[in-house]
Amino acid sequence: MSTSQPGACPCQGAASRPAILYALLSSSLKAVPRPRSRCLCRQHRPVQLCAPHRTCREALDVLAKTVAFLRNLPSFWQLPPQDQRRLLQGCWGPLFLLGLAQDAVTFEVAEAPVPSILKKILLEEPSSSGGSGQLPDRPQPSLAAVQWLQCCLESFWSLELSPKEYACLKGTILFNPDVPGLQAASHIGHLQQEAHWVLCEVLEPWCPAAQGRLTRVLLTASTLKSIPTSLLGDLFFRPIIGDVDIAGLLGDMLLLR
């Protein structure tokens, strides 16, 4: 009979003890600060895009269309430049996700290769603990995080939103008066209300069937906030163009008329 505890990580041995190989070799690592350990359960294993170049190109196309959307919003351009930058910083993730959904961008991931503990120990240089100045590699996206992202996109596809509905929804997300540091927060709040009213008019909420649709749209849109922007950058952009401030990139693209 198995002695493992319920919920114990299968990456470890019986009774949640580390694997034998790790126990035998860990003594050589005691003098070296170890990075945060990673669970190797399937849902938490790191993954990477199967077609990074194609997917990154499609993601950049979505950013370009997002810039085009912002350029066609006089109410956005009339805001103070500092507020424009803060709104981009606070909402580029949900706007990008709406663009992925609207363009029906699909992608597949595969498990990323993970160096074995033995390989890490054998390749570890003694001088590395003496302050080489190199930071450990940032963890790659997990399978669970990517699957949740795909689930959110599929929820939008099931709604079959029209281009006008997508545009109204983007407006409700863009004009967020709760973003810290806004100079015109009150005015931005009014813009958000206007975008919400237009969305309601487009969905015709006085129709009983449309009322349920409006609720589903708003609930689905609320899930976008659960997707961290770090996941979007690490999954769609970092493999090809490296670490990039996407909000800053959008701001630069807006200046290129």
Curated annotation (Swiss-Prot):
SMART domains the UniProt entry points to: HOLI
PROSITE patterns documented for this protein: NR_LBD (PS51843)
S-S pairs: none
GO molecular function: nuclear retinoid X receptor binding; nuclear thyroid hormone receptor binding; peroxisome proliferator activated receptor binding; protein domain specific binding; protein homodimerization activity; protein-containing complex binding; transcription corepressor activity; transcription regulator inhibitor activity
Keywords: Biological rhythms, Cytoplasm, Disease variant, Methylation, Nucleus, Obesity, Receptor, Repressor, Transcription, Transcription regulation
InterPro entries to which the protein is assigned, alphabetical: NHR-like_dom_sf (IPR035500), NR0B1/2 (IPR033544), Nucl_hrmn_rcpt_lig-bd (IPR000536), Nuclear_hrmn_rcpt (IPR001723)
Protein name per Swiss-Prot or TrEMBL: Nuclear receptor subfamily 0 group B member 2
Residue ranges constituting the NR LBD domain according to the UniProt record: 16-257
Reported modifications of this chain: Arginine methylation by PRMT5 enhances repression activity of metabolic genes in liver in response to bile acid signaling, by increasing interaction with cofactors.
Family annotation (SUPFAM superfamilies): Nuclear receptor ligand-binding domain
Tissue expr: Liver. Low levels of expression were detected in heart and pancreas.
Location within or outside the cell: Nucleus; Cytoplasm
GO cellular component, one term: chromatin
GO annotation (BP), single: negative regulation of DNA-binding transcription factor activity
